[in-house]
From Swiss-Prot:
The protein's name: Profilin-3
Lineage, broadest ranks: Eukaryota, Metazoa, Chordata, Craniata, Vertebrata
Tissue: Detected in round spermatids.
Keyword Metal-binding recorded: no
Subcellular location: Cytoplasm, Cytoskeleton; Nucleus; Cytoplasm
Family annotation (InterPro entries): PFN, PFN_euk, PFN_sf, Profilin1/2/3_vertebrate
Function: Binds to actin and affects the structure of the cytoskeleton. Slightly reduces actin polymerization. Binds to poly-L-proline, phosphatidylinositol 3-phosphate (PtdIns(3)P), phosphatidylinositol 4,5-bisphosphate (PtdIns(4,5)P2), and phosphatidylinositol 4-phosphate (PtdIns(4)P). May be involved in spermatogenesis.
């Protein structure tokens, strides 16, 4: 998992993905790697805390922020055993799908291009976090 720059480049080869970030969630709640100049590089430690925190009820009702962009949560199985994915959509006219995948040490956050359905990102995140989990074990 050492070469995140190459990993980010590989993920961005998928033309449906506009932005990607790898974010620590256990010891170091910061962005480890992201698309240069991308919006997701601005994910804050507070946002990571909300995503991985025990209070799921509040952000399911009020939404959450990812890199300062307000989002509606569509599906939350981020902390569920065997799934580990949260689907959201940014609010506003330029609404985009956002999908967050959970691994033992990091979150993988993808933002789709305009018009890309969240289900496509969900499948991509499941595939990617499966590979990351295998590397960790």
């Amino acid at each position: 998992m050492g070469d995140w720059k190459g990993y980010i480049s590989a993920v961005l080869r998928d033309q449906r993905i506009d932005d990607v970030a790898i974010v620590g969630h256990s010891d170091n709640r910061c962005v480890w790697a992201s698309r240069p100049g991308g919006l997701l590089a601005a994910i804050s430690p507070q946002e990571v805390g909300v995503l991985t925190g025990p209070d799921r009820h509040t952000f399911l009702q009020t939404g959450l922020s990812v890199a300062g962009r307000r989002c509606c949560v569509i599906r939350d199985y981020l902390l569920a055993e065997g799934d580990g994915v949260l689907d959201a959509r940014t609010k506003g006219l330029d609404g985009r799908a956002i999908c967050v995948g959970h691994t033992p040490r990091a979150l993988l956050v993808l933002m789709g291009r305009r018009g890309v359905h969240g289900g496509i990102l969900n499948k991509t995140v499941h595939d990617l976090i499966g590979g990351l989990r295998e590397q960790c074990s």
